[in-house]
Amino acid sequence: MQLLKQNYKKYILDLNDAQFNRAVKPIIEQDYRINQIIEWIYAKKAVSFESFTNIPKELRNKLDEKFFLRTLKIVKKEKSLIDSTIRYTFRTADKKYFFAVFLPANGKNSVCISSQIGCPIMCAFCSSGKTKLARNLSRGEIIEQILQVENDTKEKISGILFMGMGEPMLNFNNLISVLNSLLSSKEFGIGKRHITVSSVGIVPAVKKLADDNFGVRLALSLHAVDERQRKKLVPDNLGFSIEDILKAGKYYLKKTNSHLTIEYVLVKGINISSADAHKLARLLKRCDLINSDVQVNLIPFNPVTDVQFQRPDKKSINKFKSILKLNGITVNVRQSKGANINAACGQLGY
């Protein structure tokens, strides 16, 4: 009987603002209680309704009867002794597993969160791509990653990176709902310039995100300069051409006045020749993407089990970078954190 009763409970973090108000109003007597409940969930990061100490016990009991507050469990935690990065393995209520990464940085801490369990894009250099897509993460499961990491580390999170497992643009409705919560002063209150959504370039979704005008940062995972090369690295690119993806990035910039990053994983012998660098520069110029709001982020390949690619040497990386710089492109080589615990770019897999 108790199990049957539990099945009627709602996961409170799955509810957007309007849904939350509709669900809670029938059991409260004073409207101000809504803001108190929101404060306990998001600001105080309470893990049980019993801890809502400024709310009457009768209301706490009603909340506990109607809602789940948390559904995820941290089943594994690995901390790098090199840079203090932490890799979390979460288990869902339906016994599926995914990952998040805490990235400390002198008080400006970020968390890299997942949007799906597994990934349908199957990037050849990425461990997540070897994991068959199980399902989208719900709004609540995406949000709970942040709350659990803050609870565990006792550190304030000021930056959010949608760069974990999955393609955020293929979980678009939940992405939008989560962005609303992240930007809401009543909930997380994180500035739009401190949120980055990474995508392989789902062109209609990029344009829709631009039209919604959240103004968050966008990172486009390009990784190649011609279609044949990209098909090898990003097998399921859903048919969008490199130029269409870059044009969608330009559209995003014009609509949001935000910042665009072009992500480019450097793989030895595949996409790191001088010709590749010159071609990338020409592509960016043709799409009018050489300006102060655009940065190319070069990511040297991080080792992944059963993937035969190799990391290029520093000389090759620096040569590629210098060609881009000579063409007026703002370029950075990412210093991957957590590589020794399989928490860096491309390493989030089972």
From Swiss-Prot:
Residues that, per the record, bind [4Fe-4S] cluster: 119, 123, 126
InterPro entries hit by this protein: Aldolase_TIM (IPR013785), Methyltransferase_A (IPR040072), RlmN_N (IPR048641), RNA_MTrfase_RlmN (IPR027492), rRNA_lsu_MTrfase_RlmN/Cfr (IPR004383), rSAM (IPR007197)
BP GO terms, sorted: rRNA base methylation; tRNA methylation
Cofactor: [4Fe-4S] cluster
Residues annotated as catalytic: 345 (s-methylcysteine intermediate)
EC nos: 2.1.1.192
MF GO annotations: 4 iron, 4 sulfur cluster binding; metal ion binding; rRNA (adenine(2503)-C2-)-methyltransferase activity; rRNA binding; tRNA (adenine(37)-C2)-methyltransferase activity; tRNA binding
UniProt KW 4Fe-4S keyword: yes
Cystine bridges: 112-345
GO cellular component terms attached to this protein's record: cytoplasm
Classification via NCBIfam families: rRNA_mod_RlmN (TIGR00048)
Protein family: Belongs to the radical SAM superfamily. RlmN family.
Purpose: Specifically methylates position 2 of adenine 2503 in 23S rRNA and position 2 of adenine 37 in tRNAs.
Name of the protein in its database record: Probable dual-specificity RNA methyltransferase RlmN
Species for this entry: Endomicrobium trichonymphae
Native organism taxonomy: Bacteria, Pseudomonadati, Elusimicrobiota, Endomicrobiia, Endomicrobiales
